[in-house]
Design a protein with these regions (language model features):
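Structural recognition of alpha->loop->beta junctions
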Residues: 27, 96-103, 127, 209-217
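A contiguous loop/helix-start segment that scaffolds small-molecule binding in enzyme catalytic cores
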Residues: 2-3, 61, 72-76, 132, ...
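Class I S-adenosyl-L-methionine
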Residues: 1-110, 115
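Class I SAM-dependent methyltransferase SAM-binding "motif I" and its flanking Rossmann-like core
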Residues: 1-3, 83-157, 201-202
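A generic local structural motif
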Residues: 14-20, 38, 63-65, 121-122, ...
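Residue-level signal for well-ordered alpha-helical positions
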Residues: 43-44, 119, 176
Length: 277
């Protein structure tokens, strides 16, 4: 018996992985958070399966269902939104599964920040503009941030920030980040990414809070902050496809014999294993 933590993606049922859907189709127990995972995802469960919306349940309630499935020798599809490894609250479930000696597997899903970038039609890592993305949140009613993970510390890097679970904390975010990024730094609020009512608010650190208040957005939103969100045109091309960039799969023009003789003819020097930036 195995518990499968399955990432359903951020909302669009078509974004679940083939493996994730296949496992849902096979499991006799399917547990999902109905407030974050669309029913269309768990509709793939087999006829007669016990499909449970866990949105109103406690951790003890959830583990009791898993224990019952374990006693019956039935696999469990534990379906989470986005990717389970990011703010998925699976660590406490895994801890209890280990205590109960129950096997588990994690099936990755499309994270909300990646789906949002796709919808915005942007690359978040632009050569010499932004090469780092920090995924974080701010502390409000939830658990405190660990020492050293304060927003000020991340702001000092100048990296693109993807701030989760914090749309009601924009006043504090603006206060902390403005000295580092500037009041005119672009900000995008990605609301309910992947759902039919998704939409995006574009602004700056100085203007975005008013736009969010006017739109009455209070939850299920991701905050992007950083210069890469601008329509950047003045940046160098990636080295990966530059005509002068030589690697094992593309030697210098006119000298094909170099392919086999090159000392760099190793797997780590192929395009798939280099960023090209």
């Amino acid at each position: 018996m195995t518990v499968f933590f399955i990432g359903a993606g951020p909302g669009d049922p078509d974004l679940i992985t083939v493996k994730g859907r296949r496992l849902i189709e096979q499991c006799r127990y399917c547990l999902y958070a109905g407030s974050l995972v669309p029913e269309a995802v768990v509709d793939a469960a087999p006829e007669g399966a016990e499909v449970v919306d866990t949105a109103s349940l406690t951790l003890d309630d959830i583990m009791a269902i898993i224990a019952r499935a374990h006693g019956e020798g039935e696999n469990v599809a534990r379906v989470h939104s986005g990717d389970p490894s990011l703010y998925g609250a699976i660590a406490e479930q895994i801890r209890r599964l280990r205590d109960m000696d129950i096997d588990y597997r994690i099936i990755p899903g499309v994270p909300a920040y990646a789906a949002a970038a796709a919808e915005m039609g942007v690359e978040l890592t632009i050569p010499e503009v932004a090469q780092s993305i920090i995924l974080t949140r701010t502390a409000m009613k939830s658990s405190a941030m660990p020492k050293g993970e304060e927003l000020e510390n991340f702001a000092r890097t100048g990296a693109t920030l993807a701030i989760h679970l914090s749309v009601r904390n924009l006043r504090e975010i603006e206060r902390v980040l403005t000295p580092y990024y500037g009041a005119d730094c672009p900000v995008v609020i990605a609301y309910r990414v992947g759902w039919p009512d998704q939409h995006f608010l574009h602004g700056t650190l100085a203007t975005i809070r008013r736009k969010v208040l006017d739109a009455k957005i209070t939850r299920t939103a991701l905050i992007f902050i950083g210069p890469a969100l601008n329509e950047v045109k003045d940046f160098r091309d990636s080295a990966l496809y530059d005509k002068d960039h030589v690697h094992v799969l593309r030697v210098q023009r006119g000298n094909q014999d170099e392919r086999d003789q090159s000392p760099d003819n190793t797997p780590e020097n192929t395009p798939e294993n280099t960023t090209g930036n």
